Amino acid sequence: MDVPAFRERLLRLAPKDPLVLAVSGGGDSVALALLVKEAGRQAVVAHLDHGLRPESPLDQAFVRALAERLGFPFFTERVEVARIAQARGENLEAVAREVRYAFLHRVAREVGARAILTAHTLDDQAETVLLQLLQGTARATGIREREGIVVRPLLAHTREELRAYLRARGEAWREDPTNQDPALDRNFLRLFVFPLLEERFPAAKRALARFAEARAEEEGVLERQAEARLLPDPRFFVPAFRAAPLLEAPLAVRRRALRRLLEKLGLRPEARLVLLLEEALRGRPQTLPGGVLARRKGGTLFLLPPRPRLPLPPGFRRPAPGDYLERPSGRKRLVDFLAEKGVPRELKPLWPVRAEGSRVVEVLGLYPPPPEEAHMAEALAEAASAFREGEVPVGAVLVLPGRVLRAHNRVEGLRDPTAHAEMLLLREAGPEARGGRLYVTLEPCLMCHHALAQAGVEVVYGAENLKEGALTRFGLPTRARGGVRERECAKLLRDFFARLREGCRSG
């Protein structure tokens, strides 16, 4: 082991003391503690007894003695992991990992540590990559060198290198007998698969580690693109995302975005579950583990828990048979109104309403129309003007303190390819545009997206722009919100292009 090189790597990964060292008593973590001491860093030793083995008190005593010898403060807890896993009906290894990291983060908060060090090695990296490939998680990026405040400074070193380091110093370590149990997938790979691989391919572990490193770099780029495609639809009280940015994404980006969705739900990002979400995006509802229903309605992908819980503010109740709204256009049944607003059927019986008898006077978040609906109605009126003038029917309003500006596309009328509704409003507002909010019937194109971002204008749009949308077509990150009066915005565009096609046929 090259201690100076380790010192430099540790300084790069975790420049500030104190450090929290996760030490089980095994050879890897004992080597980590000794290396940190040799590097001259300040640290505390954290040891969690999982309550899984009769000899675990001996492990704790060994680690305590090691910490005292090194002059590091010692923190320990005992948690009955098997009991927790059984009560939850969850995988023992997954629960053990969750409990262990929760303990390490508590210790870090208590001592004010900026980094938690674990002793994962190149062997762990190779095993993890192969396990991920075999389990169908698809990413196969292995273990990250840094993840939040968790740092893994030994990923470049093999288990044998660390054992040689310990033997050269006459240091002892504890052996965990459960590491010899082939019933566990990781142990099976370590005990049987890798020995066979290394007979034929001696550099197999390093090759897998290099593969993981390259994949992690690629994944970082694709992850940022995938995250941009996850555009929440905040109108609903359950996880909901705009469907078009996902559907229009390149396959690799879409599947990464869907894996992120699975992780947000607390599910493993397995390939089969990603395929289920793709089916849901195409309009075929799918049930995920845990009873979560993935269903697309209109332009929104819903992830409905088995028992959705919607808030019931004081004075509100659940919908009842016969409920209706009295609107200027006439009476409308509540169930029809909720369907018009894109509320999935699973949420209709739960949506909070305030009523006088059967006459509904308020539908939470939907009626009376929120201000954004009124502003989008103004944008729709502008789009209708564009329609009548033979322009692509896109309208927009820019809401500023004390005034509202309105515009619609005038590309043909002005013979100016930049005369989009958004650009006309920015020109009119000038420096006052900063901090304003733009309501536009169609998702902005690349030109308008960049101009609005530079001007510091928040964007709310109606329909997705499948052909030129900055997010939907090109995947640019955005803080815009979409889907407001989506049906009306999309219908106006459909009607315009249908008339255009009819005119071409007539001509």
Curated annotation (Swiss-Prot):
Zn(2+) binds at residues 420, 445, 448. Residues 370-500 form the CMP/dCMP-type deaminase domain. It catalyses: cytidine(34) in tRNA(Ile2) + L-lysine + ATP = lysidine(34) in tRNA(Ile2) + AMP + diphosphate + H(+). GO terms for molecular function: ATP binding; hydrolase activity; tRNA(Ile)-lysidine synthase activity; zinc ion binding. Its EC number is 6.3.4.19. It comes from the Bacteria. GO terms for biological process: tRNA modification. ATP binds at residues 24-29. Keywords: ATP-binding, Cytoplasm, Ligase, Metal-binding, Nucleotide-binding, tRNA processing, Zinc. SUPFAM superfamilies: Adenine nucleotide alpha hydrolases-like, Cytidine deaminase-like, MesJ substrate recognition domain-like. PANTHER family: TRNA(ILE)-LYSIDINE SYNTHASE-RELATED. The N-terminal region contains the highly conserved SGGXDS motif, predicted to be a P-loop motif involved in ATP binding. Belongs to the tRNA(Ile)-lysidine synthase family. This is tRNA(Ile)-lysidine synthase. It comes from Thermus thermophilus (strain ATCC BAA-163 / DSM 7039 / HB27). The gene is tilS.
